[in-house]
């Protein structure tokens, strides 16, 4: 017997107050999810216009949205879904957080309920970077599914990209010093497609970090909303959350740690618009909405952290688009998770996730502008020529691909190169011998490095050498250098003559004054141990100036939800150019010239005192360590100790008055319900320190970096949610902060965070308050390593506080007035 729930009665008369939407739009909360129904993260619409929603850690619920929504718990053996799709009379489910096998499941209707779920494709990957959402293709022939970078790529029946992905790092990468993803390698996050019957699986694109959702626009092109690694903030390899057009065979350049590829590299495809920090969740097309034309054609991206829904307006531009971002919904306490367009033309959204309070919202247009359905689709498929060339590689088709290698449009160059990579090199590589066009030479050389043998290396390097460096554009120079990088990465270190030719071409150019060209010149010249590169780079560091705001700053500055640390960092960014030069110079072996080590480590110490994301300081420390490894013994002795010692987070803690008690979630929620306005936030700040919160968590730029930054906590969580997280920290443990239980052959075990692997050993951080305290475990002594469901955070940290002190702490955390 299914359970039915009537629409909740709201305690507050206008739950939409304080939420901003464009003129003539209206947002209303239509259902507040009771605690017993969990926290909803995915939504789809069935063929009767009803909604099916999933609890992140529980089952499925069906909602009939009306004046009083009816909610029914479905009798189906499914739980832990991150993705739902109703298509052609079948429910497809992407399982992520359950005891069930991770992967895509198919559930067919049986009356008004469902039959036994059938596993379509099993994945190895769970959690917030596991398998996510699905979307059907406009022609109904395929279903696309997106998976985060903690989801191993399973075997496929076909591959849109050539199976040639590698890490492609010219210089040794720095893995994340906090141990987030040291063993997650290419292809990273990926998107696949399959037939509605569950067969014919194809890898479609890869190189993402954690694209949670995807959608087709009104012209039938695919887009995804990829995540950032917020701990990288302040480094040159930080990549903001971004909207990407997903091309068949696309590579998007995510690699772990410092290894993320610059967006300028032609061997990956860039983004359409960068948003800055955030937590991407849902993406939905406006198709079918009773909105004005511009909003029907828009894509909508949902940001969980900063309570924002953006409308992305796409203007066709050549073979791609120009994207404009508009804030469509903003507010506080709105952790958006997913959205869908209903049969009534309204947009329905979910808020929730991580066991927070959850709700369903409805957005309608109330103005007088026309809401007539717009024409969708396009007259011709711009990818048709590329597809036919791969299917039927006639000489004429290969001629066409070769011509497009020289296109002024990046999309055409990318698609032409990836198409050629799927064909035998012998069918196109000889054309390089007489080629003079810069883009064709560069693109073909990149392609040959990725797919060919050493026989074609000489051909590619010779063609690159024929180009006139002085006549290349900035982007062409960057990719001329990248082509050389790939030849040496894939084909081995350069021979003496090869090294001499490359140095003769580029050495005197550095520095050029072009920031991105100089980054890539420095990378290759340091790899080649170019004469005098240390002195020239140190001078470039001295002249680099302060950090420059990134291109996405304007978009980020409009978001009032951003906390003080981000806003302050945008005003005073660390000099990413200098940090990149440090990254390169660490590879240059000693001895260096007189005074050069002093200048270098002086810069490293200055960088160490700067601000950045949670991993920023650890990256600087690791660069120092690796630079010392390439120094002479005498230099190591002199510079092994940094000028700035880390502060002790446990020192000088403020006193607590007490008396405390064993607080429960209900007691804390009731305390907060009595009101937090007018509280002593300065004392709340002191209680944040006294309760050891600041030892692990930052708030407004102050505190530790072991746990998540809590600055925007009040914008996402209610006091009850905050109380639950403090008192029951193991209820939800994010992938980013989870510890592992490591069992040795002798039966002993170790609890800690795996930071990295090196020299046959696993480096494990064992102190949650200090990631520098580590234990080395030989890899061959480990029998198992399993993610623990136990949080490293203790569960009674507020029990020393009296009611007034606890209210001050809650007011501080929530930003109560």
Regions found by a protein language model. Name each.
Residues 1-8:
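Bacterial N-terminal signal peptides
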Residues 10-388, 649-651, 700-702, 778-780, ...:
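Beta-propeller domains with acidic blade repeats across secreted/periplasmic ectodomains
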Residues 30, 347, 659, 667-671, ...:
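C-terminal capping alpha-helices of c-type cytochrome domains
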Residues 305, 340-345, 353, 409-411, ...:
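C-terminal substrate/ligand-recognition segments
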Residues 336-340, 344, 353, 554, ...:
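C-terminal structured "cap/appendage" subdomains that terminate the fold
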Residues 352, 365-687, 706, 713-715, ...:
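Long, ordered, helix-rich scaffold segments
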Residues 686-709, 732-735, 748-750, 756-773, ...:
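Periplasmic/extracellular electron-transfer cofactor-ligation site
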Residues 728-745:
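Short boundary/loop segments of OB/S1/cold-shock single-stranded nucleic-acid-binding domains
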């Amino acid at each position: 017997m299914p359970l039915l729930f009537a629409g909740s009665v709201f305690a507050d008369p206008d739950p939409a107050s304080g939420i901003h939407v464009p003129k003539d739009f209206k947002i209303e909360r239509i259902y507040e999810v009771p605690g017993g129904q969990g926290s909803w993260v995915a939504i789809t619409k069935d063929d009767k216009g009803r909604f099916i929603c999933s609890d992140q850690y529980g089952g499925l619920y069906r909602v009939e949205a009306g004046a009083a929504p009816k909610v029914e718990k479905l009798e189906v053996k499914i739980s832990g879904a991150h993705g739902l799709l109703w298509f052609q009379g079948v429910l497809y489910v992407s399982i992520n957080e359950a005891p069930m096998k991770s992967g895509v499941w198919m559930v067919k209707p049986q009356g008004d309920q469902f039959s036994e779920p059938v596993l379509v494709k099993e994945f190895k990957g769970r959690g917030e970077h596991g398998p996510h959402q699905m979307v059907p293709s406009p022609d109904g022939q395929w279903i696309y599914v997106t998976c985060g970078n903690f989801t191993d790529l399973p075997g496929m029946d076909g591959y849109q990209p050539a199976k040639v992905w590698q890490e492609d790092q010219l210089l040794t990468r720095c893995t994340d010093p906090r141990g987030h993803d040291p063993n997650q390698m290419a292809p990273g996050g990926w998107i696949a497609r399959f037939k509605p019957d569950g067969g014919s699986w194809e890898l479609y694109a890869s190189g993402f970090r954690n694209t949670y959702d995807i959608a087709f626009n009104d012209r039938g092109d695919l887009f995804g909303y990829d995540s950032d690694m917020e701990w990288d903030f302040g480094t040159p390899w930080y990549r903001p959350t971004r909207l990407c057009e997903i091309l068949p065979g696309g590579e998007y350049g995510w690699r772990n740690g410092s290894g993320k590829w610059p967006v300028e590299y032609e061997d990956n495809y860039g983004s359409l618009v960068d948003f800055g920090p955030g937590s991407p969740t849902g993406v939905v097309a406006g198709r079918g909405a009773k909105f004005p034309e511009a909003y029907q054609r828009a894509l909508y991206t949902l940001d969980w952290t900063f309570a924002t829904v953006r409308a992305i307006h796409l203007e066709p531009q050549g073979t791609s688009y120009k994207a404009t971002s508009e804030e469509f919904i903003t507010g506080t306490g709105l952790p958006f998770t997913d959205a869908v367009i209903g049969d009534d033309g309204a947009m329905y959204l979910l808020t929730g996730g991580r066991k927070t309070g959850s709700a369903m919202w409805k957005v309608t247009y109330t103005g007088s502008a026309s809401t007539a359905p717009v024409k969708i689709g396009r007259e011709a498929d711009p990818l048709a020529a590329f597809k036919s060339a791969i299917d039927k590689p006639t000489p004429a088709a290969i001629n066409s691909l070769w011509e497009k290698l020289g296109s002024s449009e990046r999309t055409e160059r990318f698609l032409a190169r990836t198409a050629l990579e799927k064909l035998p090199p012998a069918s196109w590589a000889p054309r390089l011998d007489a080629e003079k066009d810069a883009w064709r030479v560069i693109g073909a050389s990149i392609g040959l490095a990725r797919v060919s043998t050493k026989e074609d290396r000489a051909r590619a390097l010779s063609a690159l050498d024929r180009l006139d460096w002085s006549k290349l554009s900035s982007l062409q120079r960057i990719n001329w250098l990248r082509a050389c990088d790939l030849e040496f990465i894939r084909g081995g270190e350069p021979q003496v003559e090869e090294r001499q030719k490359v140095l003769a071409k580029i050495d005197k150019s550095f520095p050029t004054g072009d920031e991105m060209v100089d980054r890539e010149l420095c990378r290759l010249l340091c790899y080649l141990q170019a004469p005098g590169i240390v002195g020239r780079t140190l001078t470039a560091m001295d002249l680099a100036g302060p950090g420059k705001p990134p291109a996405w700053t304007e978009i980020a500055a409009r978001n009032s939800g951003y906390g003080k640390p981000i806003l302050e960092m945008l005003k005073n960014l660390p000099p990413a150019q200098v940090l990149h030069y440090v990254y390169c110079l660490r590879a240059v072996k000693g001895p260096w010239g007189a005074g050069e080590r002093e200048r270098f480590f002086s810069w490293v110490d200055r960088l160490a005192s700067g601000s950045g994301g949670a991993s920023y300081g650890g990256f600087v420390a690791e660069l120092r360590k690796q630079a010392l490894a390439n120094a002479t013994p005498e230099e190591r002795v002199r510079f092994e100790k940094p000028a700035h010692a880390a502060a002790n987070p446990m020192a000088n803690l403020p006193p607590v008055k007490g008396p405390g008690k064993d607080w429960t979630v209900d007691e804390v929620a009731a305390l907060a319900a009595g009101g937090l306005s007018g509280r002593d936030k300065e004392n709340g700040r002191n209680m944040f320190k006294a309760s050891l919160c600041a030892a692990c968590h930052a708030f407004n730029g102050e505190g530790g970096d072991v746990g998540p930054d809590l600055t925007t906590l009040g914008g996402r969580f209610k006091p009850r949610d905050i109380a639950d997280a403090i008192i029951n920290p193991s209820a939800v443990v994010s992938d980013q902060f989870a510890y592992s239980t490591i069992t040795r052959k002798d039966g002993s075990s170790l609890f800690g965070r795996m930071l990295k692997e090196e020299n046959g050993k696993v480096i494990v951080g064992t102190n949650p308050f200090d990631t520098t305290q580590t234990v080395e475990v030989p890899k061959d002594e480990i029998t198992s390593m399993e993610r623990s469901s136990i949080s490293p955070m203790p569960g009674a940290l507020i029990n020393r506080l009296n009611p007034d002190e606890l209210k001050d702490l809650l007011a501080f955390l929530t930003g109560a007035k």
